[in-house]
Amino acid sequence: IWNQVVNNQGKLTTRIYFDEMQNQFLTDNQAQFFTNLYARVRKYGAIPTGITQNVETLLARTEGRKLLSNSEFIVLLKQKKTDIAALKETISLTDALIRYIEKPKAKGTGLIIAGQTVVPFENPIPKDTELFRLVATDAYQSIE
């Protein structure tokens, strides 16, 4: 990863996606290594993106809380109550905003946090479209 970031610096923007990011915060050593890598690639012009369904695990460590609170752009979809409780300690969310991630009306509903601005969104994708087929991630969803 590091070699690619350095080779692309000043020529291309390197985007790095860390899926299941919470797995990088299971031990102190993992958390320390990952947060250093995350900061380092940002410094050299890459755009790291963390993806997790278990934000509570991420926020259980100081490094995870710092990483999230230092993020300028966050998208939150449906969250469990325990994850919401952990998020409320790190991000200022009103009860009116929490309803978009606690009990959303439909998939595709959530919050976009950009700096100090929080915008709720509802953007369900109709199931009978090519876009839905391309982005559907539910293993139990029948895709024709």
Model-derived regions, located:
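Conserved P-loop NTPase motor module
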Residues: 1-11, 101-144
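Conserved P-loop NTPase motor cores
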Residues: 1-100, 127
